[in-house]
Amino acid sequence: MAKVPVYNIEGQQIGEIELNDSIFNVPINTHVLHQAVVAHLANRRQGTFAAKTRAEVRGGGRKPWRQKGTGRARQGSIRAPTWRKGGVVFAKKPRDFSIDLPKKVKRLALKCALSSKVKENNLIVLDRWDMNQYKTKEVLRVLKNLGLENQKALIVIPEKNEYLQKSTKNIPEVKTLQVGNLNVFDILKYDKFVILQDAVKKVEEVYA
């Protein structure tokens, strides 16, 4: 089992933690990671857009002028795509973009993403982070102590902490997630992966 340092919010190392190799030390499968990211982005799409074809736009049944003799270009309908307020060629219709990956693939992708953070030395374990007020300045102070100033960081907590979650919303480069909402896209998107010690245990309980 790999050992990584455990820090407090002052940035001081206070111990070490052993990480489960079956989660944090698996071979990186880039194909599986790609599948997971594509599925995540596809599942975020609403697919509620809709436009009308020339057959669906109201009006345009009468020929605007006779075929020959006017000197103008021939036209059959004022709802042709070339006309203002005309129909759309190959109009988009509501559709479901969601991609359902097998559970084994999802789990493997998450393990690969976590393992990549360990191998790149981008995983930081915190012993605890208790907040009892909304204070973005405090979050910035802790991140500075950890050497993460002006860096993209994902903070993973074991359970809901409204003070911490809302305090990080004002920082564009930082996002806070509960273990239950952990996903491959966010793990890969953010350069640094900050996880609380209790959250590590929870991840190992769920995915080991």
From Swiss-Prot:
One GO MF annotation is:
structural constituent of ribosome
Keywords, in A-Z order: Ribonucleoprotein, Ribosomal protein, RNA-binding, rRNA-binding
**Composition-biased stretches (Basic residues):** 60-71
Q: Is Ribonucleoprotein given among the entry's keywords? A: yes
| Gene Ontology CC terms | ribonucleoprotein complex; ribosome
Chain intervals for the UniProt region annotation (Disordered): 58-77
Q: Name one GO biological process term.
A: translation
Specify one Pfam family.
Answer: Ribosomal_L4
Q: How does it assemble?
A: Part of the 50S ribosomal subunit.
Family annotation (NCBIfam families): rplD_bact
Which PANTHER family does the record associate with it?
A: 50S RIBOSOMAL PROTEIN L4, LARGE RIBOSOMAL SUBUNIT PROTEIN UL4M
According to its UniProt entry, the function of this protein is described as: One of the primary rRNA binding proteins, this protein initially binds near the 5'-end of the 23S rRNA. It is important during the early stages of 50S assembly. It makes multiple contacts with different domains of the 23S rRNA in the assembled 50S subunit and ribosome.
Family per record: Belongs to the universal ribosomal protein uL4 family.
Q: Indicate what this protein is called per its UniProt record.
A: Large ribosomal subunit protein uL4
Q: Which organism is it from?
A: Caldicellulosiruptor bescii (strain ATCC BAA-1888 / DSM 6725 / KCTC 15123 / Z-1320) (Anaerocellum thermophilum)
**Gene that this sequence comes from:** rplD
